[in-house]
């Protein structure tokens, strides 16, 4: 899954049908180049500043490569992880109401009626330091 997600994220900027492993090490050892790390940092907004973080990423890619090697031909996709049980859906009762203001009060940070989530492990600037978003 990781390798597929990384490959999909890298496919367009790197020029088409090149796979992720071709941009790492040609032998597929899981080693990652500095250019790929910089690209992933921009895409995921995650800082890979330490060797430990890069090693963790390499382990995740190696695990994804092992998963890719699993032969799934002829295996039907599962609808549920609990195949021996029936999953009952609750009745969905729609309740109309304009409660956006109440919902936004539950958030620690709000910008122009949107929730603000911290991007990965890079801390957000303080609200006073942020520039307002341009209106389109």
UniProtKB/Swiss-Prot annotation:
Disease: Combined oxidative phosphorylation deficiency 42: An autosomal recessive mitochondrial disorder characterized by onset in the first months of life, cardiomyopathy, respiratory insufficiency, lactic acidosis, anemia, and variable impairment of mitochondrial respiratory complexes I, III, and IV. Death occurs in infancy.
Matches recorded under PANTHER family: GLUTAMYL-TRNA(GLN) AMIDOTRANSFERASE SUBUNIT C, MITOCHONDRIAL
Superkingdom: Eukaryota
Stated name of the protein: Glutamyl-tRNA(Gln) amidotransferase subunit C, mitochondrial
Any one annotated GO CC term: glutamyl-tRNA(Gln) amidotransferase complex
Catalysed reactions, semicolon-separated: L-glutamyl-tRNA(Gln) + L-glutamine + ATP + H2O = L-glutaminyl-tRNA(Gln) + L-glutamate + ADP + phosphate + H(+)
EC class of the enzyme, as a word: ligase
Quaternary state and interactors: Subunit of the heterotrimeric GatCAB amidotransferase (AdT) complex, composed of A (QRSL1), B (GATB) and C (GATC) subunits.
Principal localisation: mitochondrion
Membership in a protein family: Belongs to the GatC family.
SUPFAM superfamilies: Glu-tRNAGln amidotransferase C subunit
NCBIfam families, per the entry: gatC (TIGR00135)
Subcellular location: Mitochondrion
EC number: 6.3.5.-
Keyword entries, A-Z: ATP-binding, Disease variant, Ligase, Mitochondrion, Nucleotide-binding, Primary mitochondrial disease, Protein biosynthesis
GO MF terms, alphabetically ordered: ATP binding; glutaminyl-tRNA synthase (glutamine-hydrolyzing) activity
Consequence of changing residue 78 to R: In COXPD42; decreased protein abundance
Record function comment: Allows the formation of correctly charged Gln-tRNA(Gln) through the transamidation of misacylated Glu-tRNA(Gln) in the mitochondria. The reaction takes place in the presence of glutamine and ATP through an activated gamma-phospho-Glu-tRNA(Gln).
Gene Ontology BP, a term: mitochondrial translation
InterPro entries given in the database record: Asp/Glu-ADT_sf_sub_c (IPR036113), GatC (IPR003837)
